[in-house]
Amino acid sequence: MRLLFFGPPGAGKGTQAKKVAQEFQIVHISTGDILRDAVSKGTELGKMAKAIMDRGELVSDEIMNSLVKERLEELDSFILDGYPRTLDQAKFLDQATKELQKEIDAAVLIDVSEEEIVKRISNRRVCPNCGKVYNLITLQPKEDEKCDVCGTKLIQRDDDKEEVVRERYKVYKKNTEPVIEYYRKNNKIITIDGAQNVEDVTKELFNILRSFNKQ
């Protein structure tokens, strides 16, 4: 099985991708993994990517595309998480997987509304001392706003503030919507309601992929 995973920040996309990888024994790779792997191996592309990142710049589509293709050459089954992010990357991936005869079977969309994402992320609290993460709705501390482990007052990270979350969601929709539409037109999209609890999302996803795998 060759899968792509999409979903807004806070949808639990990474969690579900890892669960699927484990259940179906597929390699789960993220763009971060691909970059780190190429840099540590010291490949030509890895050296180019490292030089760009060392300057604090973003790795170009061209280099990222080549790195992804290089990694996919080594694998038969895979889950790609965090790629493609743009329509150009999606078109490149289509072409590359056709050449490698490893075409994408499905693109999984963990779909969650903006309001649900805001509710999830803006209610996160973190202990600045020991790093334990809480949620004021789903994983409350025993004592109000205090860490169960060390008693330190919990904080809200800047990234978890409502206005930042809404901006990230807006950027996600703007960049990813055309990519999702591209796969929808090609009948590759599997949409899962990500507003369910984690276990129910996993169960639904496993059931769909099991029947899909038998085809």
UniProtKB/Swiss-Prot annotation:
Pathway: Purine metabolism; AMP biosynthesis via salvage pathway; AMP from ADP: step 1/1. ATP binds at G10, A11, G12, K13, G14, T15, R124, V133, Y134, Q196. Pfam families: ADK, ADK_lid. Residues 30-59 are annotated as: NMP. It is an enzyme of class 2 (transferase). Residues 123-160 are annotated as: LID. It is found in: Cytoplasm. One of its GO terms (biological process) is AMP salvage. Coiled coil: none annotated. Its EC number is 2.7.4.3. It catalyses: AMP + ATP = 2 ADP. Keywords: ATP-binding, Cytoplasm, Kinase, Metal-binding, Nucleotide biosynthesis, Nucleotide-binding, Transferase, Zinc. CDD domains: ADK (cd01428). Transmembrane segments: none annotated. Zn(2+) binds at C127, C130, C147, C150. One of its GO terms (molecular function) is adenylate kinase activity. Its main location: cytoplasm. SUPFAM superfamilies: P-loop containing nucleoside triphosphate hydrolases (SSF52540). AMP binds at T31, R36, E57, L58, V59, G82, Y83, P84, R85, Q89, R157, R168. The keyword Hydrolase does not apply. Catalyzes the reversible transfer of the terminal phosphate group between ATP and AMP. Plays an important role in cellular energy homeostasis and in adenine nucleotide metabolism. Belongs to the adenylate kinase family. Monomer. This is Adenylate kinase. It comes from Petrotoga mobilis (strain DSM 10674 / SJ95).
